[in-house]
Amino acid sequence: MKKRGGRTLWLVYIDLSVPRSRGRILPRSQAVNKPTLQEMVKALEALGYKYEVYPNKKYPPLWYDDRAQGYVVVKTDEKMRIIAAKVAEKIKQIRG
């Protein structure tokens, strides 16, 4: 999803606990178990992306679920799956 001059990266896109039918875009092997917005921000900083954080917004299909709270607009023209895969991999490295 392209928005506000970049790509919108919702937490659910990389969350292992969210099924693909509900919004996850990565395969289970690449997804991260219950990522936080802070982890996503650290990963984006480490990868050198420019971004804007929106912590109080909920992913519309999962408006009732706290896992779906928060997104980041990444200032890039890369494809969403590529960005999501890089961020998920970096979060795994940060976690150890």
From Swiss-Prot:
Keywords of the record: Cytoplasm, Ribonucleoprotein, RNA-binding, Signal recognition particle
Tree of life domain: Archaea
Gene Ontology CC annotations of this record: signal recognition particle
One GO term (biological process): SRP-dependent cotranslational protein targeting to membrane
First-listed, main subcellular location of the protein, grouped into a coarse class: cytoplasm
InterPro entries on file: Signal_recog_particle_SRP19, SRP19-like_sf, SRP19_arc-type
GO molecular function: 7S RNA binding
Cell compartment(s), UniProt: Cytoplasm
Keyword Ribonucleoprotein set for record: yes
Family: Belongs to the SRP19 family.
General function of this protein: Involved in targeting and insertion of nascent membrane proteins into the cytoplasmic membrane. Binds directly to 7S RNA and mediates binding of the 54 kDa subunit of the SRP.
Subunit structure: Part of the signal recognition particle protein translocation system, which is composed of SRP and FtsY. Archaeal SRP consists of a 7S RNA molecule of 300 nucleotides and two protein subunits: SRP54 and SRP19.
Name by which UniProt lists this protein: Signal recognition particle 19 kDa protein
The organism of origin for this protein: Pyrobaculum arsenaticum (strain DSM 13514 / JCM 11321 / PZ6)
Classification of source organism: Archaea, Thermoproteota, Thermoprotei, Thermoproteales, Thermoproteaceae
Gene name as annotated: srp19
